[in-house]
Amino acid sequence: MKIEILHFDKFKFDHEEQLHDIYIKRISQFRNIITDIKTVKINNKGIENRLVKKNANECFVSLDEKGEHFSTEDLKVFLFNNNFKNLKFIVGSTDGIQKGILEKSNKVISLSRMTLTHSFALIILLEQIYRSATIVSNHPYHRV
């Protein structure tokens, strides 16, 4: 499975970018279950174009505070028990995600009921993807 995280804004602080890089590197160690992971800075038009051209192997998941609440276990099941070869997560800008993009997404999930900065949402998502991969791989990172 390939995972692509589409986001609108750049990191404001060096430590945010460092955390991003750490989790991308950690996730990349699990090539047997996640063949590729990357983050792509994009605009609304770029996302709309991708949504119009999506195929049956792609799943677009928007992050929105009003979305379905997922536990770590829910995310793990969603990531590794689906038929999609390409998962594309959309992390909104300061203004959130446009209604049309939310409506065209396959799923809308919430990381928290609280409002998060786009960079924190992106880092939390990466950490949870990493945690899910460690659970599936019986890696000691996740302790129950």
Model-derived segments and their meaning:
Residues M1-I27:
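N-terminal beta1-alpha1 ligand-phosphate binding loop
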Residues L6-F8, L63, I90:
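Short hydrophobic segments within beta-strands
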Residues E16-D21, T72-E73, L102, L122:
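Conserved strand-to-helix beginnings and helix N-cap segments that scaffold or border functional pockets
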Residues Y23-R26, V77-N82, K104:
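Catalytic-core regions built around general acid/base machinery
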Residues F30-K88:
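S-adenosyl-L-methionine/SAH cofactor-binding core of RNA-modifying enzymes
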Residues E65-E68, S93-G96, M114:
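Short glycine-rich anion-binding loops that position phosphate/pyrophosphate groups of nucleotides
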Residues F84-K104:
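Ser/Thr/Gly-rich flexible loops in soluble cytosolic domains mediating phosphotransfer, phosphorylation
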Residues K99-R143:
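Structured adenosyl-cofactor binding patch, chiefly the S-adenosyl-L-methionine
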